């Protein structure tokens, strides 16, 4: 059966969600020759994955995942990564500010894949324990208003295709479906994507997964975040249907600097940058975090518009609430270690 699906994809045909689901199951559980599996994933990437295919793969992976009962509506800021622009870890800093504004956050993430650091690397450098069991993750959420869900821990089945993905050395459907697999099944999400051709498909998949509202963002400069330099295209999806609009930072009073001004570094350097933002240091890093936080607050219904969200984010940072949220996250996550 796999050969039939491989032939279809190579010839440019699309799989429906059931066929994609079955293919994912075969890749994860059957002894598919690596050359055929690589050919399938490469062909899928070449002609771009569809909403049906993403949905089928996500359904297969969710069946294998360790799920978390968060007990409340949560928001996630996990993106695909892979834009190659070297900016600091914006989504992690934004997640902390969002939580300090009173929105519960379940941050799904991983270590670095294509860049220098991932969200797990940065949080560890900040002193947060990232490898938490489901009940521990729930307790951290209850106590700090934010938790972290380390993707490999909740999706161990992906080890089955780890060698294949490393050998290919290119982004595959597994990269783009990662942010769709939060084991808390969040109600709200801001998802940055590195491939603009997949924005609509990912937005549609999020809608099928039951998100109340999600923003799928890709900047015109290639950034997989809301960019402070130039416009960002937004696919806004949820119970209201689908809307597409652009965010222009200049109209919001942000800009005048290039992406060179928000570069990251290794995990330690990135952690220092996050702390500077949370401590209220003015400049491009702060402006970028405030802009992305505002979009998350809009998504979760906490802010009526981006402008109001920016004001709320700035006030939370300046009042010390965002730094306090990080300190709680560090303390309560480390309490788990001391209790072991």
Curated annotation (Swiss-Prot):
Keywords: Amino-acid biosynthesis, Aromatic amino acid biosynthesis, Glycosyltransferase, Magnesium, Metal-binding, Transferase, Tryptophan biosynthesis. Binds 2 magnesium ions per monomer. Anthranilate 2 binds at residue 165. Its EC number is 2.4.2.18. 5-phospho-alpha-D-ribose 1-diphosphate binds at residues 79, 82-83, 87, 89-92, 107-115, 119. Mg(2+) 2 binds at residues 224-225. One of its GO terms (biological process) is L-tryptophan biosynthetic process. GO terms for molecular function: anthranilate phosphoribosyltransferase activity; magnesium ion binding. InterPro entries: Anthranilate_Pribosyl_Tfrase (IPR005940), Glycosyl_Trfase_fam3 (IPR000312), Glycosyl_Trfase_fam3_N_dom (IPR017459), Glycosyl_Trfase_fam3_N_dom_sf (IPR036320), Nuc_phospho_transferase (IPR035902). Pathway: Amino-acid biosynthesis; L-tryptophan biosynthesis; L-tryptophan from chorismate: step 2/5. It catalyses: N-(5-phospho-beta-D-ribosyl)anthranilate + diphosphate = 5-phospho-alpha-D-ribose 1-diphosphate + anthranilate. Belongs to the anthranilate phosphoribosyltransferase family. This is Anthranilate phosphoribosyltransferase. It comes from Syntrophomonas wolfei subsp. wolfei (strain DSM 2245B / Goettingen). The lineage of its organism: Bacteria, Bacillati, Bacillota, Clostridia, Eubacteriales.
